[in-house]
Amino acid sequence: MMNDNIATPFAKPLYVMLKPAGAHCNLACKYCYYLEKNHLYQNTPRHLMTDEMLEQFTREYIEAQTMPQVLFTWHGGEPLMRSIDFYRKALALQKKYAHGKQIDNVIQTNGTLLTDEWCEFFAQNHWLVGISIDGPQEYHDHYRVTPAGKPSWEKVMQGISLLKKHRVEWNAMAVVNAYNAEHPLEFYHFFRDNGCQYLQFTPIVERLTEHEDGRTLASLADNREIPLADASVTPQQWGNFLCTIFDDWVRHDVGKTFVEIFDCTLANWMGVLPGICAYSKECGHAGVMEHNGDVYSCDHFVFPEYKLGNIRDQSLIDMLYGEKQQAFSRLKHTSLPRQCKECDMEFACHGECPKNRFEKDKYGEPGLNYLCQGYYQYYSHVAPYMDFMKRELLAQRPPANIMNVLKNN
């Protein structure tokens, strides 16, 4: 059990992503990597976090923090399939166990279930809302559909309008796939023109296999040659996509529109932690807890072989600071193949997410990122711009000055 005298190994934030409704969702996006996690809990009729589980997690999670700020991240599936009363209960528990710490909440939703009531709740309690939307209607509706195959874009846009109406802070997470990657500027301008100031791109890279329990996606531990899902973006598409958007952003939107990968690139150029595990030297600092208390190494590693335990039997500290998770964290760097170790852009990329590192490098060593070619194209392309922005920051000048320089050249 946790107590006031417990000591964490080091002073840094502890992050756990919560799945209060498990993998349940009102959409059936064709590329979704999480829907099939329901197969892991086939013997559980209702994948809903109990009030008892919510309270135990809230207490332990806050007590485990060594920093004055605590971030609760609600994810899915679709977390709005839980009622507002569930989240009101969550807020009451956070207040009960806060003990002077600052509590923040962020929720990631597909946006289709947003109502005035939800948006009033988010506004009153200062929640950040992440919206999953894949750009203009044609690209979004290509993959993001209902279980009946119906489009979802119009409902998402209605949800965004409600967020704006109630002045809820929101950002966007956009999946880049084989279809929309061919239209980078139209894709980027859609978000910018809709007032989205913070934008995250997530490239789809999934391999298809078969498991006895019905799951079809491969984990990193499955090192056989496995075909890619049709929605997967190619390395060439990914590189061209990033370079094309960057060229537009660096001339018009620096300091106005914040694109996660561009921010992370500049952070690594400066030699500071980028804040996103994929572009950090090590990962494993952001676990995930399912509805029943099962804790896994990462949201992209919810596979039996990466299960750390259950909160009913072990503390969060024991699981997330334990040797199994520490080994998982170190492996991101120690498992890099020779080609990565020799690469002049390794400091910026750090091999990206381990889930995508299933190729062999030019020396025949395993562990090369499938998207390596695209990332190298991007980092090589942005290098002179990053060098300039780094110099501006070191001189305590805004990196947005680069827009004036490019305008005058």
List the model feature ranges, each with a label.
Residues 1-11, 189:
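Long, charge-rich, low-complexity alpha-helical segments
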Residues 10-52:
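Canonical Radical SAM [4Fe-4S] cluster-binding loop centered on the CxxxCxxC motif
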Residues 16-19, 71-77, 104-109, 259-261:
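Extended hydrophobic secondary-structure segments that form protein cores and membrane-embedded regions
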Residues 21-28, 78-81, 283, 340-342, ...:
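Cysteine-centered iron-sulfur cluster-binding motifs in ferredoxin-type domains/subunits
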Residues 58-73, 82-220:
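Radical SAM/AdoMet-radical enzyme domain recognition
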Residues 146-154, 161, 165-278, 282, ...:
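Radical SAM enzyme [4Fe-4S]-AdoMet core and its adjacent flexible, acidic
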Residues 302-409:
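Flexible mid-to-C-terminal extensions adjoining Fe-S/redox cofactors in radical SAM and related proteins
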